[in-house]
Amino acid sequence: MATLFIADLHLQTEEPAIVAGFLRFLAVEARQADALYILGDLFEAWIGDDDPNPLHREMAVAIKSLVDSGVPCFFIHGNRDFLIGKRFARESGMTLLPQEKVLDLYGRNVLIMHGDTLCTDDAGYQAFRAKVHNPWVQRPFLTLPLFIRRRIAARMRAGSKAANSSKSLDIMDVNAQTVVAEMEKHRVQWLIHGHTHRPAVHELSANGQPAFRVVLGAWHHEGSMVKVTPDNVELIAFPL
């Protein structure tokens, strides 16, 4: 019995080794799981479910194969792929979840999320996030021709990279008070998230008790997953 969590794969055709590693993960490790949760940024960018990128179809087929084998797959949007919609969810068999979800995992209540909402010290990013998550912004964007959406997305990624290069690492990490507030709001002692690309298990105090924040790593030269069993919560790095 095990439930698996991954995040921040940033899949793109320019990184075939990561794509191949994910396909192998779906065919091997994930097939033995009770469920797979993808906590955002599965893709490097997403400009709409109507994008004919062959990689998207390939990933949908692979995830659907996992689901059809009896392993449910759940997805929380990240900051790169927040426009993944019902069409891709239907094609891949994934179940879309809200940005925060509490799970009962073998007797543990675990809060899961992408993690970008915890980085409250980065006021500029939070303002940008609020804007692009506004349905009144998303709907007009999704009606634009694909070539225009690609240009806008490329410009936004370049702008984000430039902005991040001038920010301190502390600003781009989670805010400790925000973490505790979220865990106490949901009355949990466990939190699993991604986004920061800083894999670690942090011990803290919440609800007057010891608590744990488990941060998934990004997939680069190796993969990263959290494996939850009735007896343990493990952060695991593995070769792609």
Curated annotation (Swiss-Prot):
Its main location: membrane. It is found in: Cell inner membrane. Substrate binds at residues 79-80, 122, 160, 164, 167, 195. Its cofactor is Mn(2+). The keyword rRNA-binding does not apply. It holds the Pfam family Metallophos. Mn(2+) 2 binds at residues 41, 79, 114, 195. Mn(2+) 1 binds at residues 8, 10, 41, 197. Its EC number is 3.6.1.54. This is UDP-2,3-diacylglucosamine hydrolase.
